[in-house]
């Protein structure tokens, strides 16, 4: 593999995104799932798509009702290494069609607060199984900032498995202030399944998960004014949308459209005892050094698929202003206009981490000393990972 053209691999709980350094978009994006058929071999003939013993990504997604599905990653962290290696094989050899990964370079992403053992095992597999010549592991939130051309700011990175609030100052993650919220895209989908079930639509949490995820992506939004939207939903049909299911049935979705993503702001709705994303963001910035707070408030960057809901940026801004008003100004309106917030919601934020990784990998492509080399790994082992900087 050409060592001057590094691979960029952004592995998320929900989707794997893979491509080359310097690109504006991943070449391939596929669900981070591994499926094994539930049916016995003789029953498989009745299924239109031929079932293999192991199916990965989109091919597994298409026939998921016949499969036992495994998610190798939970909350951004690799839990099942055997299946993770199957995902990597699929990404490198089936999707990218690399003849070999030997001596190539790869930039991998990881969530903030990723256990060190996780990072260590990732490097070990890349060197010892795939024989890469150079490996670099970058923190997702920092890459999202790079994609925006910033080196300081607060990243609200909400993916499928976990939401992180990460303050970064001059490219260094302020890890003591990083907050993790265990509510993200997957929880919103599950919550939507429960809300629709209460209305009498029978959805199965596993087989219909993908269908409901698509309903969520098409119809859900974050409410700016909950009372107003609830009143509208109760008294009018203004919010009702029809959605055609894959089997041809049509369902009507009304107040569930804003009730499902509300769990990001009120985690108690999905039995998570944590403050919502607005309050967590406020607490994070307020815990930072007083000298950098205003620069952090002016550079809040949304990243990840679960930050794509219409209405999310304005609701976040509203919550920050309300919290500032009540907790800092003690309800004195005279100084409220001094509080400046800027929330950046770039249209490509679903792929922000990949884009930032592609930028960084292309800057580093010819700078061999910046990568962790196979030789360094063999000589020093895990202690060589200090190369990736503070975490």
Curated annotation (Swiss-Prot):
Q: Which Gene3D superfamilies match?
A: 3.30.420.40, Actin, Chain A, domain 4
SUPFAM superfamilies from the xrefs?
Answer: Actin-like ATPase domain (SSF53067)
What the entry lists under Pfam families is as follows: Actin
N-acetylmethionine modified-residue sites: 1
Q: Name one GO biological process term.
A: actin cortical patch organization
What is one term from the GO cellular component aspect held by the record?
actin cortical patch
The record's subcellular location field reads: Cytoplasm, Cytoskeleton, Actin patch
Q: List the disulfide bonds.
A: none
Gene Ontology molecular-function annotations: actin binding; ATP binding; ATP hydrolysis activity
Protein role = Functions as ATP-binding component of the Arp2/3 complex which is involved in regulation of actin polymerization and together with an activating nucleation-promoting factor (NPF) mediates the formation of branched actin networks. Seems to contact the pointed end of the daughter actin filament.
Other comments on record: Present with 6650 molecules/cell in log phase SD medium.
Q: How does it assemble?
A: Component of the Arp2/3 complex composed of ARP2, ARP3, ARC40/p41-ARC, ARC35/p34-ARC, ARC18/p21-ARC, ARC19/p20-ARC and ARC16/p16-ARC.
Protein name listed in UniProt = Actin-related protein 2
Q: Which organism encodes this protein? A: Saccharomyces cerevisiae (strain ATCC 204508 / S288c) (Baker's yeast)
| Upper classification of the organism | Eukaryota, Fungi, Dikarya, Ascomycota, Saccharomycotina
């Amino acid at each position: 593999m050409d060592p001057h053209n590094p691979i960029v691999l952004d592995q998320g709980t929900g989707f794997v995104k893979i491509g080359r350094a310097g690109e504006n978009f991943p070449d391939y994006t596929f669900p981070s799932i591994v499926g094994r058929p539930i049916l016995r071999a003789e029953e498989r003939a009745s299924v239109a798509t031929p079932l293999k013993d192991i199916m990965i990504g989109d091919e597994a997604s298409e026939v998921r009702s016949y499969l036992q599905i495994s998610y190798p990653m939970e909350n951004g962290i690799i839990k099942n290494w055997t299946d993770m290696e199957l995902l990597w094989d699929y990404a490198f050899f089936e999707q990218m069609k690399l003849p070999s990964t030997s001596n190539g370079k790869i930039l991998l992403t990881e969530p903030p607060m990723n256990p060190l053992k996780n990072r260590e095992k990732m490097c070990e597999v890349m060197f010892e199984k795939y024989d890469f010549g150079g490996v670099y592991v970058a923190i997702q939130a920092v890459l999202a900032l790079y994609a925006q051309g910033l080196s300081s700011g607060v990243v609200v990175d909400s993916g499928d498995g976990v939401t992180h609030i990460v303050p970064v100052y001059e490219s260094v993650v302020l890890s003591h202030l990083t907050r993790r919220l265990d509510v993200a895209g997957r929880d919103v989908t599950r919550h939507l399944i429960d809300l629709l079930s209460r209305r009498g639509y029978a959805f199965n949490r596993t087989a219909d998960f993908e269908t409901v995820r698509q309903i969520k992506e098409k119809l859900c939004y974050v409410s700016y004014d909950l009372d107003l939207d609830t009143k509208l939903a109760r008294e009018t049909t203004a919010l009702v949308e029809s959605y055609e299911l894959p089997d041809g049935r049509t369902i009507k979705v009304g107040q569930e459209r804003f009730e499902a993503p509300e769990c990001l702001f009120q985690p108690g709705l999905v039995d998570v005892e944590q403050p919502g994303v607005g309050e967590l963001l406020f607490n994070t910035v307020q815990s930072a050094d007083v000298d950098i707070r205003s620069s952090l408030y002016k550079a809040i960057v949304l990243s990840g698929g679960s930050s794509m809901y219409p209405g999310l940026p304005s609701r976040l801004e509203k919550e920050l202003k309300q919290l500032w008003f009540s907790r800092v100004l003690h309800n004195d309106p005279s100084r409220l206009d001094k509080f400046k917030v800027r929330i950046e919601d770039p249209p490509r934020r679903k792929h922000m981490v990949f884009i930032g990784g592609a930028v960084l990998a292309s800057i580093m492509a010819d700078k061999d000393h910046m990568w962790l080399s196979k030789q360094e790994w063999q000589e020093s082992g895990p202690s060589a990972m200090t190369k990736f900087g503070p975490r």
